UniProtKB/Swiss-Prot annotation:
Binds 1 zinc ion per subunit. The lineage of its organism: Bacteria, Pseudomonadati, Pseudomonadota, Alphaproteobacteria, Hyphomicrobiales. This is Formamidopyrimidine-DNA glycosylase. The active site is at residues 2-3, 58, 286. Involved in base excision repair of DNA damaged by oxidation or by mutagenic agents. Acts as a DNA glycosylase that recognizes and removes damaged bases. Has a preference for oxidized purines, such as 7,8-dihydro-8-oxoguanine (8-oxoG). Has AP (apurinic/apyrimidinic) lyase activity and introduces nicks in the DNA strand. Cleaves the DNA backbone by beta-delta elimination to generate a single-strand break at the site of the removed base with both 3'- and 5'-phosphates. Transmembrane segments: none annotated. PANTHER family: FORMAMIDOPYRIMIDINE-DNA GLYCOSYLASE (PTHR22993:SF9). Keywords: DNA damage, DNA repair, DNA-binding, Glycosidase, Hydrolase, Lyase, Metal-binding, Multifunctional enzyme, Zinc, Zinc-finger. It catalyses: Hydrolysis of DNA containing ring-opened 7-methylguanine residues, releasing 2,6-diamino-4-hydroxy-5-(N-methyl)formamidopyrimidine; 2'-deoxyribonucleotide-(2'-deoxyribose 5'-phosphate)-2'-deoxyribonucleotide-DNA = a 3'-end 2'-deoxyribonucleotide-(2,3-dehydro-2,3-deoxyribose 5'-phosphate)-DNA + a 5'-end 5'-phospho-2'-deoxyribonucleoside-DNA + H(+). Its cofactor is Zn(2+).
């Protein structure tokens, strides 16, 4: 499933083609994805101007000029593709011709303005993605967002905040980090990588990073810094291209070439002087990769 860096990369890739454009028609080629489309979705979006693109956790947000926001989740295999309706190239770094099987094109944004007519196509072979529309003022109260924790790159995330969340918790550290109520948008790949960078075991209790008085230990400061770094590095690299993720320009992300532990079972740990080997275990049905020699 695309994680925060992948969705951020898609948002940045779509922005030059979508922001400021008018949706002449929203074409729905089926009645549902993972869930049924909201009633009259095509009518509510058609004719509107896109005033901005945003992201919250793993959700792409398309702000419209009538005060509504279209919410899109990529699910397991969803992606967007930009198609020009004229010969002139679209601005921005992310632009590519058609790149996926058209039989899985389920939603088409027909756009005009700026560089001329164009289409932004949502393609989803597995159909685990979904879309919804809600008033922008009501976004924080929407069931998708009301319980989300702070963004991993935002100012709200700090060691003191995590100490409050983790205090007295016997829950494994990795599970606590994947809990979207604690931190929004973190997923399996980047949690594994952040834990390796901070030399923390995914199986240790989250509460062990907090003093008896409720203050964060130094290791928690290092963990927060590692989370910020790994997310920033992944966004800069365009995300990871594992399995179905693809950028808005049709190319692949390159952060997977920088993995230190994820999907590296049996390989040597990259920590200088460690000498350990990357192991794979299963936690809550998900693969965890870590080095037992240097992650404590």
């Amino acid at each position: 499933m695309p994680e925060l860096p992948e969705v951020e990369t898609v948002k940045r890739g779509l922005a030059p083609a979508m922001e400021g454009a008018r949706v002449t028609r929203l074409e729905l080629r089926r009645r549902d994805l993972r869930f049924p489309f909201p009633d009259a979705l095509a009518e509510r979006v058609s004719g509107r101007t896109i005033v901005g693109l945003g992201r919250r956790a793993k959700y792409l947000l398309v702000d419209l000029d009538d005060g509504n926001t279209l919410i899109s989740h990529l699910g397991m295999s969803g992606s967007f593709r930009i198609e020009e309706g004229a010969a002139s190239a679209m601005p921005g770094e992310f632009h590519h011709a058609r790149s996926k099987d058209e039989k899985h094109d389920h939603v088409v944004f027909h756009l005009e303005g700026g560089g001329g007519p164009r289409r932004v196509v949502y393609n989803d072979p597995r159909r685990f993605g979904f879309m919804d529309i809600v008033g922008r003022a009501d976004l924080s109260a929407h069931p998708f967002f009301r319980d989300l924790g702070p963004e991993p790159t935002g100012n709200e995330l700090g060691a003191t905040y995590l100490a409050e969340r983790f205090r007295d918790k016997a829950q494994p550290l990795k599970s606590a980090l994947l809990d979207q109520k604690n931190i929004a948008g973190l997923g399996n790949i980047y949690v594994c990588e952040a834990l390796w960078r901070s030399h923390l075991s995914p199986i240790r209790a989250a509460g062990t990073l907090v003093t008896s008085g409720g203050r964060p230990k130094q290791q928690l400061d290092l963990l927060v810094a590692s989370i910020r770094e790994v997310i920033a590095d992944a966004i800069a690299a365009g995300g990871s291209s594992l399995r179905d993720h693809i950028r808005a320009d049709g190319s692949l992300g390159y952060f997977q070439h920088s993995f230190s532990v994820y999907d590296r079972e049996g390989q040597a740990c990259g920590t200088p002087g460690c000498g350990g080997t990357v192991a794979r275990i299963v936690q809550a049905g998900r693969s965890t990769f870590y080095c037992a020699a240097c992650q404590k």
